[in-house]
Amino acid sequence: MQSVFNATRVSAVVGGKEIILETGRLANQAHGAVWVQCGGTVVLVTACTQPLERDMGFFPLTVDYSEKMYAAGRIPGSFFRREIGRPSERETLVSRLIDRPVRPLFTKGFRDEVQILANVISADQENDSDVLAVTGASAALSISPIPFEGPVAGARIGRVNGEFVLNPTMKEMEASDLAIVIAASRDSVVMVEGEAHFVPEDVIVAALEWAHKEIQPLIDAQLKLMELVGKAKMAVTPPVENAELKARVAELATTELDAALRIPEKMARKDARKAVKEKVLEALLADPALAENANLGREVGDMLGSLEKVLVRRRILKEGTRIDGRDTKTVRPILIEAGLLPRAHGSALFSRGETKSLVVATLGSSTDSQRMDSLVGDVTKKFMLHYNFPPYSVGEVKMSRVSRREIGHGALAEKALKPVLPQDDSFPFTLRVVAETMESNGSSSMAAVCGGSLSLMDAGVPVTAPVAGVAMGLIKEEGEYLVLTDILGDEDALGDMDFKIAGTAEGITAVQMDIKITGLPTDVMARAMAQAREARLHILAEMAKVLEAPRTELSKYAPQHAEVFVNPDVIRIIIGPGGKNIKAITAATGASIDIEDSGKVSIFAPTYEAMEMAREMVQYYDQRAELGKNYVGKVRKVLEIGAIVEILPNLEALVHISQLDTNRVEQAGDVARLGEDMTVKVIEINGDRIRASRKAVLLEEQGVEWNPEDTARPSGPPRDRGDRGDRGGRGDRGGDRRGGDRGGRGGDRGRGGDRR
């Protein structure tokens, strides 16, 4: 559609699809605004900056991704019918996906506040918006005056029938064994995030290399847009470093700081570093000129941080020795305990060095699944992994609330474990795994993966294979790359990469890579993945010593499950008016009941006895009448020809007046009274029509043989009816007045057939 606004547009063909980058139509007062479109999916990304009154000591970047429900022609399901409240889990994860590749690319020393907003304003439910938002953020920053050293582009890699697909459609993703989001610059990959179905390391590397080449047109398009509308970048004046103070700090601290950084224990090392800082400050404050510097404490802290980085990295590169004394490939000591929580369905305590995670698995019913409102409609999740990082895990005091980091780590661990879970209806339970970080000194999310796998096996969940994960680090100096296995928290902070890789012995199930340098060659990634495989196999071997396979039975405290198939016509009866019947079953048994339109009823109960009771109560509403069986029913209607008796829920039988008693009955109401119980025998089933007899029951009670072939004939001699004289003009009425060949009073009497 041709715009009447003065817009500038460029495009690139990537993965066989045109991706449009446009600016000038919307949000022109933003410092940078780009409309990114692929098919019918459109994301508007804006970038704005403003100076701060004082230096915060860090770069204040905020990224928020939002999905507007109108984009898919939907109205929000909230009470106020608008997008309010906290972001959804997906919105949080995509916000992180945008943040991670762009954050390292801001010019060093730039400390102004920056806000990136990505709003999905059109969604065709075919082309995913997340990778468009990554590219849009880079484009908005690139054309803005914000000092950003991009561009980068984002794309998703799929693999269908062994062939790589770039930016696959949502339909293609259903058949893909790979789903990796990559962000890359002209020269190298800067971010990786995704999941795989037991894919080998070499395939992952090949996918990254292939995708890096394929997304280059998006880099070209952004450079073209910069040429057309790009603004001059803001000048960044890096803070002037006090060389004299830096030299003095190094002189005072180097020896003792190096010794402190050789202490293996995290908290002892932290205390020693703190003591070094205090000693240095004490010596410096003795100088009256320095004592007047209000920022001395922060400046010294920054200088000591830089010195720590130099000392640690130099020792690793020159000596091959890390902070805790390990070489570059050794995994920290592993300790595992399974089943330590007596009433939990499954539990495991996984410890790797000073990182420890208590992971608990819980089985629930299908009604416990998570239902989410999204652009593609209502989405249901039957597996959830929640990662918690309480402040006590690192000896700190903080507000205890779920952070974006916790959501991101939980999502990564969830991706890692999902491929090994039962994929069919044979395992109908909802699963929730909670990873409580007890201690943290690096790689706590991968501890959640290992502990999560063990807790599921402890619960008896039939996973196809154990899963383990490890975090890899990197030291890069003067073109030399050194990969570190199982990094510590300090190595994460002082190093150049955090590359988390999880999988089974067969292959990879989840990856996540963040770097602090401008890019990473794929051959270095290949080396890191090969080294990670060695570590993963070692960890899996340690896990197998404690729990080699899932327990043969589910936890006795897990819900008991049964499936019942009922006639779909009785579903409304099982539910009852206003849910009366199903609520009664739930109240009596404590069971959770899920009924499908097909007639499949899933029962989840706290005990086996409760499950059986719930099953019987459900089946009670789906009973079929049996010929010759006695039933105690309620009289629902009294008619001229007899009574209607409800012998089973919503199943009624006609008791003809001739079958109400062993003696002649003149009026049905003499025997049958509305709402009273009546015991009857089913004597005929003809499709949906059922006939029953009270007389047959009475005869059986008297020990008199009842002849089902003569259901209308009363027992005993007929009553003396006296001389009734000539009835005149009515002819032969076909035998016995009480039935005989008349077929009972239900025959054709010229009143519309059977009068049931």
UniProtKB/Swiss-Prot annotation:
Broad class of the protein's primary localization: cytoplasm
Superkingdom, natural source: Bacteria
Ranges of biased composition (kind: Basic and acidic residues): 718-756
Presence of the UniProt keyword Magnesium in the record: yes
Reactions performed catalytically: RNA(n+1) + phosphate = RNA(n) + a ribonucleoside 5'-diphosphate
Domain spans labelled S1 motif: 628-702
GO molecular function: 3'-5'-RNA exonuclease activity; magnesium ion binding; polyribonucleotide nucleotidyltransferase activity; RNA binding
Family annotation (InterPro entries): ExoRNase_PH_dom1, ExoRNase_PH_dom2, ExoRNase_PH_dom2_sf, KH_dom, KH_dom_type_1, KH_dom_type_1_sf, NA-bd_OB-fold, PNPase
Residues involved in Mg(2+) binding: 492, 498
Record keywords, A-Z: Cytoplasm, Magnesium, Metal-binding, Nucleotidyltransferase, RNA-binding, Transferase
EC number(s) per entry: 2.7.7.8
Subcellular location: Cytoplasm
GO-annotated cellular components: cytosol
The KH domain, residue ranges: 559-618
Region (Disordered): 703-756
Cofactor needs: Mg(2+)
Listed GO biological process terms: mRNA catabolic process; RNA processing
Function comment: Involved in mRNA degradation. Catalyzes the phosphorolysis of single-stranded polyribonucleotides processively in the 3'- to 5'-direction.
Family: Belongs to the polyribonucleotide nucleotidyltransferase family.
Name of this protein: Polyribonucleotide nucleotidyltransferase
Gene field: pnp
